[in-house]
């Protein structure tokens, strides 16, 4: 709730800022406070009934990914009609309203950690060393995020260069990706039934195949190329979201009392992957255009699949997990 209030204030200040330096500082602060979205996920896991954690976490993550995908469309329309400052003011109001709703509906639950904040940060290193499953999940999801970010960061550039379309059209492709994200609760239910490890493998495979399908773009007419890009967006967003929900189910089971820290470590991999994807995507575009971006995304999905297929749970990890519980 404190982050919610702080984020609303930062977004409001951002809308009135005019200098480059103040925008940079406020961008940093907005990014720090926006991590409140990740605080909701372990809370949902804690409140989930036994046997339904995957489904419920999947539902929460659907909202999170839909926000990411649809933000392009919504911000593009509002900014074009009213200016970018209005978009930030509306965002500030929506976050303030979200905080009010959370304050009214979220129950109070006990904290498991009694350590100081520096000690909590230090303990995260121990969690990282103790659980190979956590390391594998963070790395696999990080590589999937590289492909995701490379695609979305360069899509508008490609559409402008090859189809002479504006950023609003690129934002509309987010609607296609949102269709894939809507299936996340189903993937959560499948994790509960068949095990999250299998879902991560299938999700990574779907991401790789969806990106690889775009190698066929030069063989198609312009209208069919756009259709294939939209279908690929549905496919890899579904695969990425399914893998993310399953990875969360995996890591939350390692040490239930440390779910918040485990989630932070998992999403460190996600955010590092997002940043690398934007950087590498622009480099790939400069070197070889859209085919190079597709190759990068396909390779990233393939690496994630290899990680998921080759990782096994070690006896020492099982012992550590049982001791923690």
Which stretches of residues belong to each language-model region?
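Helix-to-loop junctions at the C-terminal end of transmembrane segments
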Residues: 1, 183-196, 285
